[in-house]
Amino acid sequence: MALTQEDIINAVAEMSVMEVAELISAMEEKFGVSAAAAVVAGPGAGGEGEAAEEQTEFDLVLTGAGDKKVNVIKVVREITGLGLKEAKGAVDGVPATLKEGMSKEDAEAAKTKLEEAGASVELK
């Protein structure tokens, strides 16, 4: 019995952030493509000025852990709900997208918490 598109989507929805990142890497290798190239090409198609004004969803990207790595891991776990191993993997593997599609208020609050813990963070 073949898997349906819905089955695949449900399976991905149950994965942790780290598992999804590993899946993406495996798919890039298998098919010889890069997900980053598709993301970069997307905003160029529309008006960049309009996109900047209308942005309502933000991605929280950890760009550095700083000296207080343990504190950063604790905050990453709090924000994402990841387990210790997954949070440590995200902190060790910077840059790492911690959360996608966040509202501006939630993204700013998470960014502030991470910066207070000693991390460097970007909102995209």
From Swiss-Prot:
One GO term of the biological process aspect: translation
Q: Which GO terms describe its molecular function?
A: mRNA binding; structural constituent of ribosome
Extract the CDD domains matched here.
Answer: Ribosomal_L7_L12
* Presence of the UniProt keyword Ribosomal protein in the record: yes
Q: What Gene Ontology terms describe where this protein resides (cellular component)?
A: cytosolic large ribosomal subunit
InterPro entries xrefs: Ribosomal_bL12 (IPR000206), Ribosomal_bL12_C (IPR013823), Ribosomal_bL12_C/ClpS-like (IPR014719), Ribosomal_bL12_oligo (IPR008932), Ribosomal_bL12_oligo_N_sf (IPR036235)
Q: Where is this region: Disordered?
A: 102-124
UniProt keyword GTP-binding present: no
Segments of skewed composition (Basic and acidic residues):
102-116
User: What keywords sit in the KW lines?
Assistant: Ribonucleoprotein, Ribosomal protein
**Source superkingdom:** Bacteria
- List the NCBIfam families hit by this protein, alphabetically: L12
The protein's job, in short, is: Forms part of the ribosomal stalk which helps the ribosome interact with GTP-bound translation factors. Is thus essential for accurate translation.
> What protein family does this chain belong to?
Belongs to the bacterial ribosomal protein bL12 family.
- What is said about its interaction partners and assembly? Homodimer. Part of the ribosomal stalk of the 50S ribosomal subunit. Forms a multimeric L10(L12)X complex, where L10 forms an elongated spine to which 2 to 4 L12 dimers bind in a sequential fashion. Binds GTP-bound translation factors.
Query: What name does the UniProt record give this protein?
Result: Large ribosomal subunit protein bL12
